[in-house]
Amino acid sequence: MADKSDLNALSGRFRGYYPVVIDVETAGFNAQSDALLEIAAVTLQMNKEGWLLPDETLHFHVEPFEGANLQPEALAFNGIDPTNPLRGAVSEHDALHAIFKAVRKGIKDKGCNRAIIVAHNANFDHSFVMAAAERASLKRNPFHPFATFDTAALSGLVLGQTVLAKACLAAGIPFDSSQAHSALYDTLQTAKLFCELVNRWKKLGGWPLPAAESG
């Protein structure tokens, strides 16, 4: 188990939180009524020198829950055909159960207390994950019920950009717009962006925190 006093350990960097990068693709903006169609998650790790890196990736196409709204505008935007059998979609329960299981293992292995969602405009992704978990009656949700790390806000501060593609490019991370609005691609790029922002702060001397002056 990791030592929470080790500032180069993941458990020591974010107050015991285990950050997991999430992106969802949906059939609308309402987490209660609109379908969750795709979800990806990237866990993170810290090396011995305290640099944050992407770790494991999980990705699922998701079947719309019974009675879910499918907004035509949203489907046209993300290009998803929920009826396409080649999607290999699974239920919300199966997708989130697999993600939650992997996240709980990561929390334990890294010596953390609880997971926290990292996402671009994080409130959107967080709301869909929480709503789907409730519909699926998944009781052991490892994620904080409201706290998130929002890479849109962090990018606005550090890079002067809030759009994911522009923030990635400003950070020196390639971004292929033709692959955008794929949950898998967006999650991978968001994970790279979050790691870059955290590591850049470390390079600038912002972490570990300077010891408080005595007297």
Curated annotation (Swiss-Prot):
Task: Give all residue intervals belonging to the Exonuclease domain.
Answer: 20-194
Obligatory cofactor(s): Mg(2+)
Query: Which keywords appear in this protein's UniProt record, sorted alphabetically?
Result: Exonuclease, Hydrolase, Magnesium, Metal-binding, Nuclease, tRNA processing
* UniProt cofactor note: Binds two Mg(2+) per subunit. The active form of the enzyme binds two Mg(2+) ions in its active site. The first Mg(2+) forms only one salt bridge with the protein.
Q: What is its EC number?
A: 3.1.13.-
Name the top EC class.
hydrolase
Q: Which residues bind Mg(2+) 1?
A: D23
Q: Which GO terms describe its cellular component?
A: cytosol
Spell out the residues of the site Important for substrate binding and specificity.
Answer: F29, F77, F124, F146
Q: Which NCBIfam families match?
A: RNaseT (TIGR01298)
What function does the entry list?
Answer: Trims short 3' overhangs of a variety of RNA species, leaving a one or two nucleotide 3' overhang. Responsible for the end-turnover of tRNA: specifically removes the terminal AMP residue from uncharged tRNA (tRNA-C-C-A). Also appears to be involved in tRNA biosynthesis.
Name-wise, this protein is Ribonuclease T
Q: Which organism is it from?
A: Yersinia pestis
